[in-house]
Amino acid sequence: MLYTEKEKHEIERVKEVFAERLRQSPDFELLWSDKVGYVWLTIGVNPLYVDTGIRIESAADLCYKCLDDVAMDVLYMTGNDHALEEADPLELAEIKRRWEPYINQLPDYAYLCKDLLNGKM
């Protein structure tokens, strides 16, 4: 068994909260494999390429990946080439603002925001 029924249900719940973002992102694809479960595939559309695939181990793992992607969007938007834990106060405020709708629906995963900002995981 790839995931317990409870684990798969929780992954599906996180997937649903981030559904629009998952559909629209040009940077990754979330795929299902009968052999390994959910796979986070790093891709590019311009130029077209497929990079690395990482198995999603848990709902927290998927939520972390999605929240990290939201934060990276802000850093790309500002044109600053630095790590998330080095974000300036304006970037941090925008990242937290963009995280809020997701964390409001997934409050059990709010701790991941702190982990991301502290460079953990």
Predicted regions and their residues:
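Short acidic DE-rich linear segments
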Residues: L117-M121
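Acidic, low-complexity, intrinsically disordered interaction modules
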Residues: D34-Y111
